[in-house]
């Protein structure tokens, strides 16, 4: 049996910087908060969105920021995203070798699925896991635990591929 492989989405399969930073700027602007330039917001790619907005606008405005962010993201931001070169070929090769492939992202699952469909990658994955819009499963460790349980996979028999410390911590 080949090793099941879990991939993060943002920063691993795609470069979401433009969409994420523009949506953060939009949310902050709408609430008349200081708006950092896009480069100063790259640290927000990876961790749960609510957590980033707590740091940017404070706990009292974080939920409003998330709502505004998602309004723009659902219409525009998810398409302000670039597929990394070679990703489709890699996924195809892994599937042809017999690996079961999964996505495990702290981004809401509904958006993950739309992005995978947009880039015609959905066909390579046996399962797609993401957080829920109500905030459940934002923690990468909790999300991976859920995905492993749903798929009947032992964690030590699988691999997590990601780009941030949240991915590494979640896989432990």
Specify the residue positions occupied by each region the protein language model found.
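Short helix-capping segments at alpha-helix termini
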Residues: 29-35, 96-97, 120-124, 151-153
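Substrate-recognition "cap/lid" segment bordering the active-site pocket of phosphatases
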Residues: 109-159, 165-172
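N-terminal helical cap/lid subdomain that shapes the substrate entry/recognition surface
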Residues: 2-88
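Short beta-strand immediately N-terminal to the catalytic nucleophile in serine-hydrolase-like folds
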Residues: 104, 161-162
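Acidic di-acidic motifs
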Residues: 16, 162-163
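Short, acidic loop-to-helix structural element flanking the phosphoryl-transfer center
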Residues: 75-103, 109-113, 138-141, 145
């Amino acid at each position: 049996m080949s090793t099941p492989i879990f991939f993060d989405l943002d920063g691993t399969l795609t470069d979401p910087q433009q969409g994420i930073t523009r949506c953060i700027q939009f949310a902050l602007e709408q609430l008349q908060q200081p708006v950092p330039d896009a480069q100063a917001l790259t640290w927000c790619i990876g961790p749960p969105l609510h957590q980033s907005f707590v740091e940017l606008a404070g706990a009292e405005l974080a939920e409003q920021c998330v709502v505004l962010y998602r309004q723009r993201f659902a219409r525009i931001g998810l398409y302000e995203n670039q597929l990394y070169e070679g990703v489709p070929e890699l996924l195809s090769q892994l599937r042809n070798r017999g690996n079961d492939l999964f996505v495990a992202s702290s981004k809401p699952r509904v958006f993950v699925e739309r992005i995978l469909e947009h880039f015609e990658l959905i066909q390579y994955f046996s399962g797609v896991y993401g957080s829920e819009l109500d905030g459940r499963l934002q923690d990468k460790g909790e999300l991976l635990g859920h995905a492993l349980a749903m798929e009947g996979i032992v964690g030590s028999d699988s691999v997590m591929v990601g780009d941030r410390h949240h991915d590494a911590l979640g896989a432990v």
